[in-house]
Amino acid sequence: MNYAKLSIAFSKKTIKTHNCRLFQRWLHVGDKVHDFRVVDTKKVPELQLNYTRLKHEPTNADMIHLDREDPNSVFSIGFQTPAENDEGIPHILEHTTLCGSNKYPVRDPFFKMLNRSLATFMNAFTASDFTFYPFATVNTTDYKNLRDVYLDATLFPKLRKLDFLQEGWRFEHADVNDKKSPIIFNGVVYNEMKGQVSDSSYIFYMLFQQHLFQGTAYGFNSGGDPLAIPDLKYEELVKFHRSHYHPSNAKILSYGSFPLEDNLSALSETFRPFSKRELNLPNTFLKEFDQEKRVVEYGPLDPVMAPGRQVKTSISFLANDTSNVYETFALKVLSKLCFDGFSSPFYKALIESGLGTDFAPNSGYDSTTKRGIFSVGLEGASEESLAKIENLVYSIFNDLALKGFENEKLEAILHQMEISLKHKSAHFGIGLAQSLPFNWFNGADPADWLSFNKQIEWLKQKNSDGKLFQKLIKKYILENKSRFVFTMLPSSTFPQRLQEAEAKKLQERTSKLTDEDIAEIEKTSVKLLEAQSTPADTSCLPTLSVSDIPETIDETKLKFLDIAGMKAQWYDLAAGLTYIRLLLPLKNFPESLIPYLPVYCDACLNLGTHSESIGDLEHQIRRYTGGISISPSAVTNNSDVSKYELGIAISGYALDKNVGKLVELINKAFWNTNLSNTDKLAIMLKTSVSGITDGIAEKGHSFAKVSSASGLTEKTSITEQLGGLTQVKLLSQLSREESFGPLVEKLTAIREILRGTSGFKAAINASPTQHEVVEKALQKFMKSRGVNQQTQTKSTSKERNGINSIKTYHELPFQTYFAAKSCLGVPYTHPDGAPLQILSSLLTHKYLHGEIREKGGAYGAGLSYSGIDGVLSFFTYRDSDPIRSLSVFDEASEWATTHEFSQRDIDEAKLAVFQGIDSPVSESQKGMLYFVDGVTDEMLQNRRKQLLNVSANDLKAVAKKYLVNPKKSYTAVLGPKSEKQLPTWVIDKFES
């Protein structure tokens, strides 16, 4: 620190500074900087940060700054935006504010900035009662650029009607070039929310919240109900912005090592046109009610789960005002005591007993609303068991109110909190920016919310008699009349009813259209298409240049050594936590057993051992470690995509003092699991498929990409078997088996193969002082297996069959589609890999975004390139017309061979690519690219040089070779049954 550069002058408690971040540490309550008055300062040692809260006196804007030695600095501005109906105004406004502003009138500056920046994070979010716009970057110029774009976008947006029609909703012909085609609803948010109602967990939670919070802003869908979105008028959107997007209603957060003074100066200048305004916002506080409420609704039938066990139900209790940080913390801990882990009382009573397969989406304590809600919910239940479940819930609470909880359980939870504070991710600031606003907007003191140590001290003091949680149960559960019982029953006709409701809505609206209205719709469609097709003049937007990209990598200093007979790498950390990763390569592993590897890995942490129950084992894991993970691994050879290495990956971390215990627990879980415990195996399988369809609906583009890529190489075929729709079908089948004998035989066979397999390797990220204790622990681990360690280097290279069909259509009960087309590229070390990586960014931003999102209305689209796997994948997300999108994929490939890319285009693509490459890596993850994928620093540096040198000719050459004339390409679509004839497709049906 250079204190000589610090210049501070005091004049009537007003501070003037010369651009130095150190001044904020000297600020006191009452000081004034650029119209901002300091109202609070605190040190938060457990998070290693200094907290400063300020008020902008002319407008009353609220700001907090979290000063921390972290170059990945964050900025966010948010506004309280409680919904007033189901039309999705807050959500659509979130989109349209980012479509051009006074200072930056270009269409869609948000997406344009994605490839003019080195941001490590850029996004915007609409919650139930607020909207916020966060970003993060390690580059100071970039930070200022993005801050200016975000501030102008939110406070001075253009809010053009054409942007509203594109992002929100519009009428248009199904084929915009055919006036005889039917008129439909379209729009980005409209299709996004149609995709959301494909998720039964989302439907359950939204219906639950709307019924419970009726009469408050939470009773409306802030994201928008697809049946209500077409009722929204453009003028209402503009009015909502004027009333809500104002500094008086704003909360600003900055985090990291960049100067606070610069932010205050920029904000003060931006806020200059505004004056303080009194706010009149809808009520968000739910008052108590005198008697229990009950509601039954209907939701979709899951094709993966057993039809008779798909009821979701919950009993909810109104709890505290969440602005009370300390009581909120205590209720969060109570929730963990009740629901977390195999030995928790509600898991044992509701799931282990077989009454349900998993907790419902709203289970536990929810503090994201102004009034906290404590819920006990279950999914995978039968309708006949509802009364029994309800009686059991009250019986358990009565028992807990009498007996309380074992102190060991509480200590394990507090240990997890302690270790999580020490385990810092590379995106720690964004994590705070995404979690803090929920309570901040609801009146909580952010300083109290951040001070975890004070919360724990308060908890221990209040629980000194050991009865705090019993008192909370009596107060908020047993003596609480404000109860709400909500149940959602499955309906096989639910998707059909949604489609019929949409058709009815469309018919009602279009039947009222006059000839003049239709002519205006067609005229507007032409205008919108022209605007979308006109190249944007982005000269007004700030940008970084390729020269801002460092030419050399930061070297990862690894030590290579032999530990307990294993080849190992070591990365030095400061004392505190020790991270251990183990990888066991599987050579010539039986093909028939490969799909069962995920089941085996899950079994290791779900069944317990012959001498310890899974509840006891899990308690030890929580008490002594930060967690243990066991999973299958499949990695492509970085010099030959036809080769790959299959394996088992094991990882865990603990406080330095608990490393011996960590490895002991890994040993128990990996080598000594009781695979014959079929009762627990049945529960594990049923839980694994519970809600799995919702996961597909949320990440449908990923499943589509995996499906379409599965026929390209041996490794991509294995990836699909381990984590694609093939695995989903296997889990569904296994979960319905009446006898688990055959499965136990397969799992036992896998363990015997693992016992006889050599080649373990290790990666340790820890303090050098930990070497001896780590070696002793790993020696015990290796001896317990009873096999001599021998390194194997031969890669698996046996032909495997992927998906045989060129085009596969996966029928699922969704409201929108996901499409993907995959082609084979090159291995990581091949020189064509760099231009393919740049090309994927170019086509995403310069062609696919405009053609599929803007014109087609899909929520997302792009071209991804996996440098390790050598796979190019076109994809769409929540798409209304996947067949059209597949044609656009082909058009994009041709366009890439004929379009004259400017140097600006290429430079922007390079910036976008390096956002990912240079994204900060936490200390705990250093060296993992080499450990897992075998990519050395030399390879990384060579790839970096190739990327920086990519030319327009390189791009055209690889586009023609790998996209227009691919050696192999496969296509997949996920979605509802197609109305179109698909004679050349293989139809893959998911049926209950």
UniProtKB/Swiss-Prot annotation:
InterPro entries: Metalloenz_LuxS/M16, Pept_M16_N, Peptidase_M16_C, Peptidase_M16C_assoc, PreP_C. It comes from the Eukaryota. One of its GO terms (biological process) is protein processing involved in protein targeting to mitochondrion. Its cofactor is Zn(2+). It is found in: Mitochondrion intermembrane space; Mitochondrion matrix. Zn(2+) binds at residues 91, 95, 192. The keyword Mitochondrion applies. Its main location: mitochondrion. GO terms for molecular function: metalloendopeptidase activity; zinc ion binding. Its EC number is 3.4.24.-. The active site is at 94 (proton acceptor), 167. Keywords: Hydrolase, Metal-binding, Metalloprotease, Mitochondrion, Protease, Transit peptide, Zinc. Gene3D superfamilies: Metalloenzyme, LuxS/M16 peptidase-like. Pfam families: M16C_assoc (PF08367), Peptidase_M16 (PF00675), Peptidase_M16_C (PF05193), PreP_C (PF22516). Binds 1 zinc ion per subunit. One of its GO terms (cellular component) is mitochondrion. Degrades mitochondrial transit peptides after their cleavage in the intermembrane space or in the matrix, and presequence peptides; clearance of these peptides is required to keep the presequence processing machinery running. Preferentially cleaves the N-terminal side of paired basic amino acid residues. Also degrades other unstructured peptides. May function as an ATP-dependent peptidase as opposed to a metalloendopeptidase. Belongs to the peptidase M16 family. PreP subfamily. Monomer and homodimer; homodimerization is induced by binding of the substrate. This is Presequence protease, mitochondrial. The gene is cym1.
